[in-house]
From Swiss-Prot:
Pfam family membership, one: DUF846
Gene Ontology terms: biological process: protein secretion; vesicle-mediated transport
Predominant subcellular localization, coarse grouping: membrane
Renumbered residue ranges of the record's region Disordered: 1-21, 254-276
Locations listed in the record: Membrane
Similarity annotation: Belongs to the TVP23 family.
Spans traversing the lipid bilayer: 52-72, 126-146
Sorted UniProt keywords: Acetylation, Membrane, Transmembrane, Transmembrane helix
Protein's recorded name: Golgi apparatus membrane protein TVP23 homolog C
Record organism: Homo sapiens
Amino acid sequence: MLQQDSNDDTEDVSLFDAEEETTNRPRKAKIRHPVASFFHLFFRVSAIIVCLLCELLSSSFITCMVTIILLLSCDFWAVKNVTGRLMVGLRWWNHIDEDGKSHWVFESRKESSQENKTVSEAESRIFWLGLIACSVLWVIFAFSALFSFTVKWLRRSRHIAQTGLKVLGSRDPPASAFQSAGITGVSRCPGHPSRKFHQVDINSFTRITDRALYWKPAPRLSSPPLRAAPGNCQQMAPARLFLSLRLWAWRGGGESPNSRGTGEPGPKFHLASGMH
C-alpha cells in the first residue's frame, strides 16, 4: 500500500511547482491568468495589425518585416513556455539522449477527478481561438498577396504560415518559429481534445521534412577507371604527364618516327628557342 501510494504521488505531481496550489480549485468559466491571456493575444494580434498598417506606419519594408518577426518570436516563446502550460496545461520540449538522438516530449497536466479541474473554460477558449484564428488569417494574407501579385508580402506570409513544417523537420528549432509551430506542438500533447485525429506516423513526416530541408544533390556517377599498365600515359595525371614529356624533350631522349628501328637518336628539343 505504501509503495502504491508513493507511485500515485509520483504520477500526480504537477508539471509546475507554482501551480500545485491550484489543483484543488474547481473548473470555472473565469480567467484565472489575465496576464498570460493578454499576452497570448497581444503578440499575434499586434503582428497582424503591423502587417495591415505597415505602409501607413513606415515606408521601410525591412522595418516592418523585423517588427513582425520579433512579435511572432515572442508569441512562440510565450505559447511554448507560459500560456500553453498555464491556460490549457500543455507543454512540449526537445532533448537529446546519450546516443545523440533528438526526442520530442509532449506532456499534459493530469487531473485527479472530474470535479477538480485545473483548466478554465474561458482561458481554454481564448487560447485555442487565438492560436487557430490568427494562423488562418496569415494563410488568407498569403492567398490575397498571391492573387494581387504582391510578391514581397506573399514572401512574408508564406514564411510565417509554413514555419511549422520547418520546425518539425529541423534538429535545432529556431526561436523564430511562429504560428503553426505552436499549433503543432500543443496539438501533439496527450491532453489535446483532438488528439485522436493525430495518429499519423509523425516520424515518417519528420523524415520527409528532413529530406526537403536538408536536401543534398546526389553524387555524380563517375566512369570506371581505365585499366592501363603501370607507367602508361592513360594512368598518369595530366600534370605529371606534361612534366614527363617536357623532361623527355629537354633530355632529347627517344627516337623520332623517321629513325625508329635504325638506332639513331631523334632530334633534340630545347626549352628556350635561343639555346643550341
